[in-house]
């Protein structure tokens, strides 16, 4: 018993030493792989624990003959076997994966029967460095590119986005001089994975992907252009929104004609887009109508909006078709109200408020449009703001706490608070206006929206002369170094 106890302690110390070496290896320290193999580690473990192959086979739930062949080098270790051996040695999952890559793939043979399962297992354990190392080695032989890409697709569909992105990046890097659909799909996936709350980064991500859209399958191009247009819309890049929307509408009309004309009907095996084809035509008009609103061309905006209010021409059928047809009709009603409000037609305000009451999920956008119209046309909308005071406070508190979904949602909410600040400052309700404006600056800093940070600064400077010294000090703190968590908490109550 005493000998077994001492041996056990020695093995624990040895395992800790191995882990220490492995950690330092990742940091640029000692190289475990240069002096060790999985088999040598296993043999040393058996020696120090005084276990026979039969005893360890029972502990690891492996057949003793199989284990003997592995130790004697007569057969390579399969992934499942390696995991069992690792557990039986009391080591953490995936401990030997880097050695496995060296021993059996880089120094052995690149057998996809080992590579594929190893990539998936590394993804399960979030071993991204191992994935990159393995993928780079595999891509030395371009014949593996389709298999590697398919693995990335499997991970993407399973929600393992970081692991998928690591593989997409390597496939794209290796095939960067190829004019292939696979390269374009890699960039498409990287685009969707990389979108975040950082607006500057989103612009870079969109610009990197856009040149690859035309290399995608014609059907994939529709969804890609839709997502690009939505990204540019969140970035207030209206020229790019219009460009992407126009391309999407043109391509969708071509595909729609191919589908509905019997003499040119697509085959049943043709790839289908994520939505019915008419959706992309109508959504193109919706986006272009929004662009016209932003540019102040309200007559043309109404033309686009009336065009998707009547979709009687649609010949596609099914529940999904009816779902989107009804939604576009509802959206057209609201968007026509918005255009008329922006043009100064206050008579539709009551009708638009009634629409918002029936569609509470549109509240943020609804209030944003009402405030933009009020600020542009110097309208008094106090009654409407009083009606939604509780909801506005909730939106404000969520922004201060950072409780939001994606960049587009936070962008809209931050814009709403900016318009509120503008509204109250113009009305000379300075305490409320400055409080909201400071919150606005914080949130535009969070999403790195330089355009609206500049607009917020411009608005503050316009009213600086009526700001208290305390407010000016808080303002300078935000601009010079950003607010600390404690300082941000000072701006938590609406109208304080």
Where are these regions (language model features)?
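C-terminal non-catalytic interaction modules
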Residues: 25-51, 387-394, 417-496
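DNA major-groove recognition helix of helix-turn-helix/homeodomain DNA-binding modules
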Residues: 80-95
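Solenoid-like repeat scaffolds
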Residues: 62, 102-105, 123, 135-142, ...
């Amino acid at each position: 018993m005493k000998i077994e106890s001492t041996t056990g302690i020695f093995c624990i110390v040895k395992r800790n030493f191995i882990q220490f070496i492995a950690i330092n290896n990742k940091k640029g320290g000692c190289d475990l792989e240069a002096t060790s193999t999985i088999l040598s580690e296993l043999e040393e473990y058996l020696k120090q624990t005084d276990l026979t192959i039969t005893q360890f086979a029972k502990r690891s739930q492996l057949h003793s003959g199989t284990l003997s062949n592995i130790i004697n080098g007569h057969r390579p270790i399969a992934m499942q076997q390696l995991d069992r051996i690792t557990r039986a040695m009391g080591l953490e999952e995936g401990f030997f994966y880097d050695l496995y890559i060296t021993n059996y793939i880089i120094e052995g043979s690149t057998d996809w029967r080992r590579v594929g399962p190893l990539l998936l297992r590394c993804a399960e354990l979030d071993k991204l460095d191992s994935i990159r190392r393995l993928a780079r080695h595999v891509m030395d032989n371009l014949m593996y590119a389709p298999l590697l890409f398919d693995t990335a697709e499997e991970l993407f569909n399973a929600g393992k986005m970081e692991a998928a992105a690591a593989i997409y990046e390597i496939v794209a890097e290796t095939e960067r001089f190829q004019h292939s659909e696979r390269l374009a799909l890699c960039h498409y996936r990287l685009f969707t994975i990389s979108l975040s709350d950082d607006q500057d980064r989103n612009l870079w991500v969109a610009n990197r992907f856009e040149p690859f859209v035309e290399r995608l399958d014609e059907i994939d191009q529709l969804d890609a252009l839709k997502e690009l247009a939505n990204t540019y819309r969140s970035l207030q890049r209206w020229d790019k929104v219009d460009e992407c929307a126009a391309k999407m509408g043109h391509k969708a009309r071509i595909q729609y004609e191919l589908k509905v004309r019997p003499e040119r009907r697509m085959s049943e095996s043709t790839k289908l887009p994520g939505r019915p084809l008419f959706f992309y035509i109508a959504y193109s008009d919706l986006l272009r109508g929004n662009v016209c609103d932003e540019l102040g061309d309200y007559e043309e905006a109404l033309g686009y909006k009336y065009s998707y209010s009547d979709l009687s021409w649609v010949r596609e059928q099914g529940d999904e078709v009816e779902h989107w047809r009804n939604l576009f009709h509802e959206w057209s009603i609201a968007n026509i109200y918005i255009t008329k409000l922006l043009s100064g037609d206050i008579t539709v305000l009551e009708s638009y408020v009634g629409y918002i009451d029936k569609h509470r999920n549109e509240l943020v956008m609804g209030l944003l449009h009402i405030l933009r119209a009020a600020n542009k046309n110097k309208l008094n909308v106090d009654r409407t703001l009083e009606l939604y005071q509780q909801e506005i406070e909730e939106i404000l508190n969520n922004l201060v706490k950072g409780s939001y979904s994606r960049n587009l949602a936070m962008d809209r909410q931050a814009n709403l608070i900016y318009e509120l600040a503008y509204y109250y400052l113009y009305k000379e309700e300075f305490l409320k206006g400055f409080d909201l404006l400071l919150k606005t600056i914080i949130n535009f800093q969070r999403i790195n929206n330089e355009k609206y940070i500049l607009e917020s600064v411009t608005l503050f400077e316009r009213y600086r002369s009526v700001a208290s010294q305390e407010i000016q000090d808080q303002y300078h703190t935000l601009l010079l170094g950003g607010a600390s968590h404690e300082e941000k908490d000072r701006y938590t109550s609406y109208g304080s």
